[in-house]
Amino acid sequence: MNIFLRHGEVKNPKDILYYNIPGYELSEKGIKQAEHIAEKLKKDFKIEKIISSPLLRARQTSQIVNKMLKKEITFIDEITEWGGIKNWIGNTTFEVQQSKEFEIYINDPTELNTNESFFDTFKRVNKLYENNKNVLFITHQDTIRSFMFYKLESDNFNMDKPSHCDLQYIEKNDLKKYINPV
């Protein structure tokens, strides 16, 4: 079974949409979330390999988790953040909420005209998913949402947004999740 893990909480005092801006590292809470989820993964799941986004927050999460799992980690771009709305990057959440695209993003983000569609995100992640077994994918919220939406043929893109260091996986064609209590 392949499992998706969203990275831990990020230190972001200015509430910036950071996407791929360098330097956004895990907060103290994010570190604790990753430590907790590592214990859960070791206890309850068979993980043979870790595939992680190369972005700092995901790399840090994977390294913390791997202190307990002790598996091979591969950092690859195919599991990175959704290509998204470029003019949002570097803006505050408040500024993003004022944009014309924000309402579409909230209601039905599959209708957005962006550099990378959510379906394109699904396709790049699905290739990895189909070609691997017992892998922990450490990635980002919209990447996980895109994958689950299309893989499960859902009618609601916003059904289950993973919070920081939550797990999501598919079992018998059904979404299963573990909500990190930290």
Can you name each region flagged by the protein language model?
Residues 64, 146, 150:
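Active-site signature of alpha/beta-hydrolase-fold catalytic machinery across serine-
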Residues 25, 67-124:
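Phosphate-handling substructures
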Residues 57-59, 82-83, 143-145:
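Short, active-site-adjacent cap segments at secondary-structure transitions
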Residues 2, 131-142:
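Generic beta-sheet signal
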Residues 154-181:
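Domain-level recognition of soluble alpha/beta enzyme cores
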Residues 2-72, 165:
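Active-site-proximal alpha-helix that buttresses catalytic centers in soluble enzyme cores
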Residues 43-46, 67-72, 130-135, 153, ...:
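Short glycine/proline-enriched coil/turn segments at helix->beta-strand junctions
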